[in-house]
C-alpha cells in the first residue's frame, strides 16, 4: 500500500488537515499558516485510525525491527503509541513535556528496563523541538532510541537540521508535498494557490507577517 498517498487523502477527507491560503490560521508559535493539522481527529474515524495504525506498524517493522518498546510523546502521541503497542504486543511508556508537580513527579510514565530499544511516536512534526526534548529525556533515563515515527511532517528544513544534529532518524507516513499534491488532484485547493502554499513552506516564520 502507498501509505504516503492514502494517509494524505484520509487526513483531507476527515478534515484533520485544513487548507486556507487566503485566510491563514495562527499557530501557537505565532506563525501564520495556510494549513492546520489536527491528527487527533483520526482517532474518531476507525478507517483512518486503522490505516494509520497499520502504516506506523509497517514503519517500525521496516526501519526499526529491533524495537522492544513504544514511547508516546504527550499528549497526541500517547493514543497512537498505545494503539501500535497493542497491535505489536509491546510494552509502552510515554513522556511528559515536564515532570508532574505532585506524586512521584515523573517525566517518563511507565515501567520498562533501562537499555531497552525504543521507538518514539509523534502525531505531527513541525520543527521537531518538543519531540526531540522527549528523546533527550528518554536518553537521560538510560534508554536506547532507535528512532522516531509520526503520521505527518511539514518537511521544514529546520526540522531536518534538528533531527540530524540530534542524531535521530525520523520516518513519517505522509508529508506536506504529498498532501498538497493530493489536495490539488482532489480539488481541496486550486492550482493557482500552489505558489502561496510553496512560499509558506520555504519561510514559515515570516510568511504574511
UniProtKB/Swiss-Prot annotation:
Molecular function terms, GO-annotated: magnesium ion binding; orotate phosphoribosyltransferase activity
Residues annotated as signal peptide: none
Cofactor(s) named in the record: Mg(2+)
Keyword DNA repair: no
Alphabetized SUPFAM superfamilies for the sequence: PRTase-like
GO biological process: 'de novo' UMP biosynthetic process; pyrimidine nucleobase biosynthetic process
Residues reported to bind orotate: 126
UniProt catalytic activity: orotidine 5'-phosphate + diphosphate = orotate + 5-phospho-alpha-D-ribose 1-diphosphate
Pathway: Pyrimidine metabolism; UMP biosynthesis via de novo pathway; UMP from orotate: step 1/2
Keywords: Glycosyltransferase, Magnesium, Pyrimidine biosynthesis, Transferase
EC number: 2.4.2.10
Top-rank EC class of the record's enzyme: transferase
Keyword Transferase belongs to the record: yes
Top-level taxon of origin: Bacteria
Positions with a binding annotation for 5-phospho-alpha-D-ribose 1-diphosphate: 96, 100, 102, 122-130
Subunit composition and interactions: Homodimer.
Family statement: Belongs to the purine/pyrimidine phosphoribosyltransferase family. PyrE subfamily.
Function comment: Catalyzes the transfer of a ribosyl phosphate group from 5-phosphoribose 1-diphosphate to orotate, leading to the formation of orotidine monophosphate (OMP).
Name of the featured protein: Orotate phosphoribosyltransferase
Organism listed in the record: Cytophaga hutchinsonii (strain ATCC 33406 / DSM 1761 / CIP 103989 / NBRC 15051 / NCIMB 9469 / D465)
